[in-house]
């Protein structure tokens, strides 16, 4: 799985990894998400609905992705709780809604343990500085993500960027690694190869551990 803040470049990385491994990429349902634009225009009314929508779609994607080795999932179910808790802290999701969401998530996670493959082989976390996040959000041009005249949205992005760093430190559902996409601009082929080599190395350690 790939993980990281909005705009960090994880979707690009997901495609590169899948092409490199000759497998399938499962992308976050953004373009065809009818709730996402509504959420950005009115987060207090649509925060809970958005997280339930993502959770439902993500669960279906995970079951498909775990069916074969080396499939790559763009963003994980482990991150969804982070967004939901942040929306709760912002007042967009009530405590009751948060509890309902977490109970549903727990039930889904329990069901995942029944699958032959219970967890990802590796979580690849992408990171960059906050100014680069803002630049990339502007560059990709989704109207509802733009923050020039919305300081509250920019503040939300900063809070999520900060929260992600703590989330990575605490993540323990699978082996993990961090990629600095400030250092490695994935528009450059040489950087693509360097990042893929790092991922190959980590996967090699996981799948062929040295016997002592």
PLM regions: where:
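Hydrophobic positions on the alpha1 helix immediately C-terminal to the Walker A/P-loop
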Residues: 13, 17
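Conserved lysine of the Walker
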Residues: 10
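A basic- and aromatic-enriched beta-loop-alpha substructure that forms the phosphate/nucleotide-
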Residues: 58-101
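Hydrophobic anchor at the beta1->P-loop junction of P-loop NTPases
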Residues: 2
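A glycine- and Lys/Arg-enriched "phosphate-lid" helix/loop adjacent to the NTP-binding pocket
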Residues: 83-163
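P-loop (Walker A) phosphate-binding loop of NTP-binding proteins
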Residues: 5
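Conserved substrate/cofactor phosphate-moiety recognition/catalytic segment
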Residues: 19-60, 82-86
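NTP-dependent small-molecule kinase module
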Residues: 138-212
